[in-house]
Amino acid sequence: MPIVVLSAQTINKIAAGEVIDCPASVVKELVENSIDAGAKTINVHVDKGGRNLISVSDDGCGIACEEMEKAFIGHATSKLIDGDLANVKTMGFRGEGLTAVASVARVKMVSKHVDAERAWSITFEGGEKTRDLTPGVLSCGTHVEVRDLFFATPTRLKFLRTEKAEMQNIVDLLNRLAMINYTIAFSLTIVERQIFKYSAQESLIERLKEMRAFGEVFCEQSLEINHSIDHVRVYGHIGLPTFNKSKPGMVHTFVNGRPIYSTLLLGAVKSAYHGLIPKDRHPVVVLALDVMPAYVDVNVHPSKMEVRFQDKRLVYKAVLDALGEALSSNVYARFSPAATTSEGHDHFAMDSIEKTYGKFFSEDTEAASTMQLQPEVLNHNIPLLFGSSHVDDSKGTHDTRFCADHTHHNDTKGSVHTKSFSARSSSSAESKMEQGCMLEEPPLGYAVCQLFERYIISRAGDYVIIVDQHAAHERLVCEYIKKVTEQEGIKRQVLLMPEFIELGNEYELELLTEYREKLRDLGLIVEPMGDLTVVVREVPAIFGVVDAKALISKILESIMAKGDELFVKGKLSHICGTVACYSSIRSGRIMKLEEMNSLLRHMESTPHSGQCNHGRPTYVKLKLSEIDKLFERT
């Protein structure tokens, strides 16, 4: 067959396949045009999942009469100047949207320019103009109707999913666009039924309150983030670790006001929540980035759902720092049963832990599970696995209010639990509060009793707080181990036989050389030996027996993917969590009131104390009004 030049109509249909692959793609192109036109209100109507009808109306600046036909010419746009791809600030810029839609459907557009006296109308079918410009009826902005989608490309029509599935795609897309463009009012109507209507808002959090997927519950169980570094600003709202979901899909990412999908950003979110939520649960995150246009490429794919960052490491670090700062500053995460929580957690077999890590446990470590919890000495009795036993606590915040007159004393047996619960211990706590002995009530209140030798019951104002003693102490031990690691470094073990490893290329050698000091700080000594060979002489002692070659391979993979040595950090964090689980107070341990209160005070000053190392909540709060509802009291 001889080579022939395809007709413009065929070329447009082929190109349309990349831009318009489903009804949601049509909605995306038209709504993005409305946003770029400065619309304050955008209304979308859909019928039959978008196959029969998609109409988008806005009150934007409109299109001048003499430019309406030009708008349907391929790569004709008012949003980009030749050679200015490095400074894209609009949602659209390729000039393909209207051309692609008109190539595969019947399109009618009515528009009234802000400076014009009247509106004008034009129609296209299958890429061909079917009616010249005629006067139209419209008070302002632009109205576009798309009918019989893919009538000109029957093959594409056969591959559409069910009406319900296509409709859900449209709902999800519009919600993402409405989420980040919170200053614009949005509405979606299917035939005669209004699916949602969002008012223009002044802030992102107010828009999230309107949305069914988030609402007031998320806003109460979320943290605001706002962090800048160089040319990158990270902002948004992230759910508390205890507010998690069983299915993924609630991490929404945006770059310069554009909904995007990025494995880099998803990886940073996953790393930030590592150890704070269970492995089978997923966080709820609304993450937005403002990046200077010169440092991000949005011209990756016609769908504009992917972007490339010039400096991946900087972006990854900015997101990780923003989320990490917010999550760590929220020392004791508030939690109530209204939040979606995880169910169950990983149980660690005792014999397995002892077999794997036993040689790193000192006598003090093994005795930690029965240690006395006193405010002055709690941290010093937590097992030390790295370096010497001295830790500088000059910056610590030991709470000394539970001494002398401020201590709730127990009976002579030193235990308050369900088998011997007495009204005297409860009334004692109340009398202390009534007498005004405490200048300020601590956030987690004061212990009242121990329940089932597993839970601590405390009262703080109108709240009853139930604390899982093992989960809470597990987090305290883990954070203490991290503190020791940061102050004294990680204890290393010298390999009897240094392991020589041949790298794949010079780039890998450069990366290991660049990260050599950081890896040293993490207990891994790697030295170049010439050519493409490195030698591993020392590894973190807590790793035990380790495959050095596999370890180096994983480290290189982590550095190349995320620009950080997070694989080593993650492995250390996992082991520290396992050790903390083994070393913490077990369920069934009877505790004195002063021990319970000591645990509460340390929870208030310890990062991430709202969750154990497996992501389970360490406590729940029940408000008096919630308890009243259980008894149908008004």
Curated annotation (Swiss-Prot):
Gene of this entry: mutL
Region (Disordered) location: 406-427
Keywords: DNA damage, DNA repair
InterPro entries to which the protein is assigned, alphabetical: DNA_mismatch_repair_CS, DNA_mismatch_repair_MutL, DNA_mismatch_S5_2-like, HATPase_C_sf, MutL/Mlh/PMS, MutL/Mlh/Pms-like, MutL_C, MutL_C_dimsub
GO biological process entries: mismatch repair
Family matches, as SUPFAM superfamilies: ATPase domain of HSP90 chaperone/DNA topoisomerase II/histidine kinase, DNA mismatch repair protein MutL, Ribosomal protein S5 domain 2-like
Molecular function GO labels: ATP binding; ATP hydrolysis activity; ATP-dependent DNA damage sensor activity; mismatched DNA binding
Protein name, entry field: DNA mismatch repair protein MutL
Function: This protein is involved in the repair of mismatches in DNA. It is required for dam-dependent methyl-directed DNA mismatch repair. May act as a 'molecular matchmaker', a protein that promotes the formation of a stable complex between two or more DNA-binding proteins in an ATP-dependent manner without itself being part of a final effector complex.
Recorded family membership: Belongs to the DNA mismatch repair MutL/HexB family.
Keyword DNA repair tagged: yes
Gene Ontology CC: one annotated term: mismatch repair complex
